[in-house]
């Protein structure tokens, strides 16, 4: 639609509204009926509101037309002015001012245009759902009538009748909004689907608590009029939560109720309020509206924050007295100190009042009913999940970091499906039905479907390249691409790929001109080329193809397998199935006797025994292995998929699998029988010869390699003991080595051994040596070290090389001292949290103090934090390499079976959270700490590391008065300028808006956290606070930071720059990174070179009584016993291998 056509359309709608006003005014003059006059007044009021909206839309359209005709110069000037105002007076982008859903359903709605768009989508969806309800109830009525169940039939019929009335209401309301809607998609700045699709998860989260709702009165409702009754009918109001009736008012004929309800809610989402008229014995719905519990909770939060700000007298940046003028350093110090003292007195007075008034805060307003009328409601909601926190100065408290763990992945045709929660209505891209709350979504292409449907998806994920496809996989040769064209969406429809509701308008929607499916513009290239065919039909065809291929392969395999199996079974005098023959062919061979054993002993079957007597434990293990083999044979016989997979192995076994025995004539007998069976199947002769030759060669090589490994292992052990071990130690080691070989021979599958149990002191030292080399040089990777001889051929060569390596490095390894937890005395607990514990420890060798951070391996494995642990170690080494003055350095790291340990330098001055909670920081002191933190962040960013967990608890104070950043658990490397990541992590009050929106983000998130940190140091409270995480997140996304009205302009300026919600416009987000922040007027009297070289005297030096003084740490930590709970070893070899190379022992270690 062109601008001229759109302008004509708006003028027509304006004329309609003017006619409604004239007609209602004329009718009102000619009647004395009170009801008619009231209706006319309502029509006039609504028409004037619509008229104002249409005239405003016409002005916007003409302005846009003028801008296009004059060029873009004027718009660029306006944008430049807006960006200047945006940079200092507001931290929000002009496009971010979107009203909440609760604001849009209020009678005094701030934006009628947004309400029209929101209600059009909601009414379309409700209409579709109600039609489904009506259809289902109609079918149920007929079914119950057939069964003769009159009671259930009447209930279903009543439900169908109510759905009929609801559909009439919704259609009427939908036509009302469609009549005045103006489509501005040609020059729209903001997509319509922001209200739903891009809402963070917590915005529509199910809540638990107590809902307080007061229903006072209603007005302008179109009640049912009957000529038989002079009085208005009785009216009720019902309250539903997630389609369940929770409360109902008393009947009223004058639309006044004045009733209050307190409704306990358990994981509720949507509230429905419906007005019913009672006609005879039936209730007929006449008006309806919907609210979300999360919107009510957000409204209560804003109202509570507003009350607190009014009591404090704080304002946003645009109302600061100083404006943009920059005060002198002395003036800013005095002003801020005065403000801080005022804050202290105010916050101390209001802490108790804030707690007591939380449950009493409510919102009262007139809300719009559909299709006509308004209702006066008083709404309040108290969450039962709110955490009672100890209120300290300004409300600052400790909070652990959060991180989104990796979800379980379900793979299907290259898709990586994970289970996701959705709090708006989604549509399955496979079957087309609605999803309620949860579904399976591909991490790569965002394809969405039910859990029950994901196994039926036949289309490849776009992330799967052609080289990843299986050549034998069944394919559907239906390649008819869609013809997607831009189209205007006029109803509520869902994307056929990602399942989200499609926005209204033309820019973001595509429709296939052939088959009619619709999708987002960004999803069009992901939709498979199945034009004219549904997903379900494609799946049926593909399954038929797969079944046909499977049956054909089964027929080919059955005839020859049966013949050959019967011939072999007859020849051996036993009936052996092909699967058992395959099992025998693949079974490991018995070990060969050693060279010094002249005659084979019966006791040596399956092992090398040091004695000639039977060992009852060994016999028991052998019997258990036999029992396991029988279970495996039974499983193989019953598993068709396994038979398909092992078809080649079966054929090999059928021709060349002799009985395993020590009888040297057995092989000849079995070969003779095999030749006999081959004569009965001439068609397979050439293939069978090839298979038999390969198997015999494989057997010979295997026996030779096993014998060689045993000989080499014995010789190497002897060489290692020469000139270093006395006779007694040598005998002890010989006995241990023999036991090791016995255990190795007994264990048929040695995949669950523990490398940490297998290490002797020498191999442990070798591993430490290799680990330190690998970390410092970052060029050599540590090869696994193991003393066991593996029984699989692919592990034999590495074992030999590892043993040789241990012999070569023995002399050097013997000089390196081993460090373990036994080398330390554990003194006090310094802190604990999600990560584990930090314990003050003293070295037994040097009496040096250190802080040991202890992490449990099983927690790291369960939470998929292996990469985080590696990154933490890497950042520790980065800080230690240059001995950075403001970063915590690492002494060493080591591990046990169940834990890993970082031995760090002990910083005895406590963290800044303790100091801020116990003493207010002056501006000079806060600026000094901020400068040192800034230089630490600069070093991280210059080396491609983002920190992501900057907060007061992670900044420690040294005995000299300087700061050091600690806890590198959330750091990520390889984050240079322009690189992005998307992990949802951080401490709630410090998380940047782009993280909460689950967008990809850059190093700019550290500058947002730096702004929050500086705000807390100067004003002793958070710029964005709430009673729980969801409230904090909402505050970060929607609220402006507030300041004392007399705060200095330079302080406000740096806050506004760092706390800008748009990451591209944020201070420090450019290529110059920290240099932008260092050039701010706030730091103009700071010499950063002197700060870096510790030439500036700290403004505060903590009083530390002794090296072991922990008075600056929380007593709840230091009073806990410094012990580690014993843990059972539950990690497998593969899990332990994840921690290989973690240990770090520098050459100059002095512990």
Swiss-Prot record:
Write one Pfam family the protein is assigned to: HR1
- Residue numbers of Phosphoserine PTMs: 226, 761
The reply on keyword Zinc-finger is: yes
Q: Where do the annotations place ATP binding? A: 830-838, 853
Zinc fingers (Phorbol-ester/DAG-type), renumbered ranges: 414-461, 481-531
Gene Ontology molecular function, alphabetical: ATP binding; diacylglycerol-dependent serine/threonine kinase activity; protein serine kinase activity; protein serine/threonine kinase activity; zinc ion binding
Cited SMART domains? C1, C2, Hr1, S_TK_X, S_TKc
Instruction: Name the job this protein performs.
Output: Required for cell growth and for the G2->M transition of the cell division cycle. Mediates a protein kinase cascade; it activates BCK1 which itself activates MKK1/MKK2.
Tell me the protein's name.
Protein kinase C-like 1
> Origin organism of this chain?
Saccharomyces cerevisiae (strain ATCC 204508 / S288c) (Baker's yeast)
């Amino acid at each position: 639609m062109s601008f001229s056509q759109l302008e004509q359309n708006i003028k027509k709608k304006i004329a309609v509204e003017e006619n409604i006003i004239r007609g209602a005014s004329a009718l009102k003059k000619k009647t004395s009926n009170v009801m008619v006059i009231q209706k006319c007044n309502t029509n006039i009021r609504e028409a004037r509101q619509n008229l104002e909206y249409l005239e405003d839309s016409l002005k916007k359209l003409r302005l846009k037309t003028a801008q296009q005709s004059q060029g873009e110069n004027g718009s660029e000037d306006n944008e430049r002015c807006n960006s200047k105002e945006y940079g200092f007076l507001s931290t929000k982008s002009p496009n971010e001012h979107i009203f909440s859903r609760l604001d849009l359903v209020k009678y005094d709605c701030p934006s009628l245009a947004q309400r029209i768009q929101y209600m059009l989508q909601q009414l379309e969806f409700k209409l579709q759902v109600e039609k489904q309800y009506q259809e289902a109830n109609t079918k149920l009525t007929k079914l119950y009538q057939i069964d003769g169940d009159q009671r259930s039939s009447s209930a279903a019929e009543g439900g169908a009748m109510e759905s009929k009335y609801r559909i009439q209401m919704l259609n009427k309301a939908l036509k009302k909004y469609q009549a005045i809607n103006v489509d501005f998609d040609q020059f729209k700045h903001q997509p319509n689907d922001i209200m739903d699709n891009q809402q963070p998860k917590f915005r529509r989260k199910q809540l638990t608590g107590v809902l307080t709702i007061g229903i006072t009165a209603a007005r302008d409702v179109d009640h049912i009029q009957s000529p038989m009754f002079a009085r208005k009918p009785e009216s009720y109001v019902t309250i539903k939560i997630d389609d369940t009736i929770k409360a109902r008012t008393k009947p009223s004929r004058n639309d006044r109720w004045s009733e209050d309800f307190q409704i306990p809610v358990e994981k509720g989402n949507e509230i429905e309020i419906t007005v019913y008229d009672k006609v005879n014995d039936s209730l007929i719905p006449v008006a309806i509206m919907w609210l979300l519990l999360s919107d009510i909770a957000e409204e209560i939060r804003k109202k509570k924050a507003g009350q607190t700000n009014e009591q404090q007298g704080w304002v946003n940046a645009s109302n600061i007295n100083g404006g943009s003028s920059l005060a002198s350093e002395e003036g800013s110090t005095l002003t801020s100190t005065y403000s801080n003292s005022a804050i202290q007195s105010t916050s101390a007075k209001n802490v108790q009042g804030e707690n007591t008034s939380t449950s009493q805060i409510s919102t009262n307003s007139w809300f719009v009913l559909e299709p006509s009328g308004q209702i006066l409601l008083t709404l309040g909601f108290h969450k039962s999940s709110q955490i009672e926190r100890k209120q300290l100065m300004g409300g600052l408290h400790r909070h652990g970091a959060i991180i989104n763990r990796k979800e379980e992945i379900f793979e299907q045709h290259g898709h990586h499906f994970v289970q996701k929660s959705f709090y708006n209505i989604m549509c399955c891209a496979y079957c087309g039905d609605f999803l309620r709350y949860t579904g399976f979504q591909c991490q790569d292409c965002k394809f969405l479907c039910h859990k029950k449907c994901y196994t039926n998806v036949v289309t490849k994920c776009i992330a799967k390249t052609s080289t990843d496809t299986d050549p034998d996989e069944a394919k559907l040769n239906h390649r008819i691409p869609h013809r997607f064209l831009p189209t205007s969406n006029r109803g509520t429809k869902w994307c056929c790929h990602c399942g989200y509701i499609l926005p209204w308008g033309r820019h973001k929607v595509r429709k296939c001109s052939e088959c009619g499916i619709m999708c987002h513009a960004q999803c069009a290239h992901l939709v498979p080329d199945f034009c004219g065919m549904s997903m379900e039909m494609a799946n049926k065809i593909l399954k038929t193809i797969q079944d046909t291929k499977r049956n054909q392969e089964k027929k080919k395999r059955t005839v020859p397998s049966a013949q050959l199996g019967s011939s072999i079974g007859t020849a051996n005098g036993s009936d052996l199935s092909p699967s058992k023959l395959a099992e025998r062919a693949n079974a490991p061979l018995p070990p060969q006797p050693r060279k010094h054993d002249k005659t084979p002993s019966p006791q040596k079957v399956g092992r090398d025994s040091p004695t000639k007597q039977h060992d009852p434990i060994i016999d028991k293990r052998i019997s258990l292995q036999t029992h396991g083999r029988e279970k495996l044979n039974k499983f193989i016989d019953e598993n068709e998929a396994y038979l398909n997979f092992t078809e080649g192995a079966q054929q090999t076994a059928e021709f060349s699998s002799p009985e395993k025995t020590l009888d040297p004539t057995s092989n000849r007998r079995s070969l003779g029988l095999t030749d006999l069976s081959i004569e009965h199947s001439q068609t397979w002769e050439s293939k069978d010869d090839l298979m038999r030759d390969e198997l015999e060669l494989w057997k010979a090589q295997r026996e030779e390699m096993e014998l060689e490994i045993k000989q080499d292992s014995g010789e190497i052990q002897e060489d290692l003991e020469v000139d270093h071990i006395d006779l007694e130690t040598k005998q002890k080691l010989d006995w241990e080595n023999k036991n090791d070989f016995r255990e190795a021979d007994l264990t048929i599958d040695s995949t669950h051994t523990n490398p940490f149990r297998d290490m002797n002191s020498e191999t442990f030292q070798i591993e430490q040596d290799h680990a330190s080399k690998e970390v410092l040089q970052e060029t050599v990777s540590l090869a696994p070290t193991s003393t066991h001889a593996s029984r699989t051929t692919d592990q034999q060569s590495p074992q030999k090389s590892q043993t040789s390596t241990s012999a070569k490095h023995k002399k050097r390894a013997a000089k390196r001292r081993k460090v373990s937890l036994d080398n330390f005395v554990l003194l006090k607990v310094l802190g604990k949290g999600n990560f584990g514990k930090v314990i003050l420890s003293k070295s037994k060798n040097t009496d040096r103090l250190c802080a040991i951070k202890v992490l449990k391996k099983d927690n790291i494995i369960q939470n998929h934090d292996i990469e985080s642990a590696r990154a933490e170690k890497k950042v520790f080494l980065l800080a230690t390499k240059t001995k950075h003055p403001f970063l915590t350095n690492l002494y060493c790291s080591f591990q046990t079976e169940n834990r890993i340990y970082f031995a760090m330098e002990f910083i005895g001055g406590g963290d800044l959270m303790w100091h801020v909670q116990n003493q207010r920081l002056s501006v000079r002191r806060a600026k000094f700490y901020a400068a040192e933190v800034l230089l630490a962040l600069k070093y991280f960013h210059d080396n491609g590391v983002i920190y992501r967990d900057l907060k007061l608890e992670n900044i420690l104070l040294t005995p000299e008065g300087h700061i050091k950043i600690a806890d590198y658990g959330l750091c990520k490397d390889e984050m240079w300028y322009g690189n992005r990541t998307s992990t949802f992590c951080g401490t709630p009050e410090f998380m940047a808006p782009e993280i909460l929106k689950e967008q990809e983000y850059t190093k700019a998130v550290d500058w947002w956290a730096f702004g929050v940190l500086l705000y807390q140091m100067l004003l002793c409270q958070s710029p964005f606070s709430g009673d729980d995480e969801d409230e904090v997140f909402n505050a970060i996304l929607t609220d402006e930071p507030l300041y004392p009205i007399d705060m200095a302009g330079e302080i406000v300026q740096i806050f506004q720059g760092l706390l800008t919600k748009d990451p591209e416009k944020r201070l420090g987000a450019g290529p110059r990174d920290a240099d932008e922040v260092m050039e701010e007027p706030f730091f103009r009297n700071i010499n950063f070179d002197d700060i870096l070289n510790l030439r500036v005297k700290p403004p505060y030096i903590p009083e530390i009584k002794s090296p072991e003084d922990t008075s600056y740490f929380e007593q709840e930590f230091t009073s806990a016993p410094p012990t580690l709970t014993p843990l059972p070893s539950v990690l497998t070899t593969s899990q332990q291998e994840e921690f290989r190379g973690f240990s770090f022992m520098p050459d100059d270690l002095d512990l």
